[in-house]
Amino acid sequence: MSGPIVIFDSGIGGLSIFDEIKKVLPDQGYCYLFDNARLPYGELEESVLIKGCVDLICEQVKRIDAVLVVVACNSASTLVLPGLRARLSIPIVGVVPAIKPAAQISKTRHIGLLATHGTIKRSYTRELIKEFAGDCKVDLFGSSELVMLAEAKLAGEKLDLIKLESQLKPIQHSDLDTLVLGCTHFPIIADEIQQVLGAGVKLLDSGKAIAQRVSYLLENIEDKLDNSAGELMAIYTTEEITPGLATRLAEKGFTTIASRSSANLD
């Protein structure tokens, strides 16, 4: 029998993907695995990121007999999917920046991508733009500071609007009409981003599309639920997390919240 879905990210950004998946699969079991010891991923060397992510995810999949993996991190998805698929026989779902739908809905043919520096510089991102937004002007905006602002918000801290406005200033000076949130952390602060940029800029992310893909894949997996169905566990890679973050995870229904080093999940 198979166990829960593993949703993986460097930090709490993947919770935006978890929320969308849980809406369509409310009774499924989930393991939210976040590598906060190495946050933010957008600043890591590619070789370090690949090996660390693949080893960590494979270890957790085998430990809990997971049925499917969602790599809920744009920076990681651009690099680690081949390595995971080579080692695991279960479905692996990555997150792709919503370039295609942004190009489809833009009225001015001018869109933007807001992501980590790692995602911005990858050739995979350029190929997406070339394939799906070749007739658009595409502005690229890199920020790791926004990742940390989202982390702080979900941990219960007050969002630093001055820092947020500073990070978004280049976008304010652009005349784009559609902005892709190309990091799963960014939907967590989407309301604040919208407030700064104004109603004239449409924000897009990949959450709903990922949820639909996961639902489709699970329909083709027999015995996808077992006695652990509905159980929610959150595993992190630091020794501890802040009380504020632990509270937020509990509010989302996670009953097991533990460090990877101390979690006894066998």
Curated annotation (Swiss-Prot):
Class in the EC hierarchy, top level: isomerase
Catalytic activity: L-glutamate = D-glutamate
Superkingdom, natural source: Bacteria
Active-site residues per Swiss-Prot or TrEMBL entry: 73, 183
Disulfide bonding pattern of the chain: none
Matching Gene3D superfamilies: 3.40.50.1860
Keyword Isomerase: yes
Cleavable signal peptide: none
Residues given in the record as substrate binding sites: 9-10, 41-42, 74-75, 184-185
Pathway as given in its UniProt record: Cell wall biogenesis; peptidoglycan biosynthesis
Function: Provides the (R)-glutamate required for cell wall biosynthesis.
Family statement: Belongs to the aspartate/glutamate racemases family.
Protein name: Glutamate racemase
Name of the encoding gene: murI
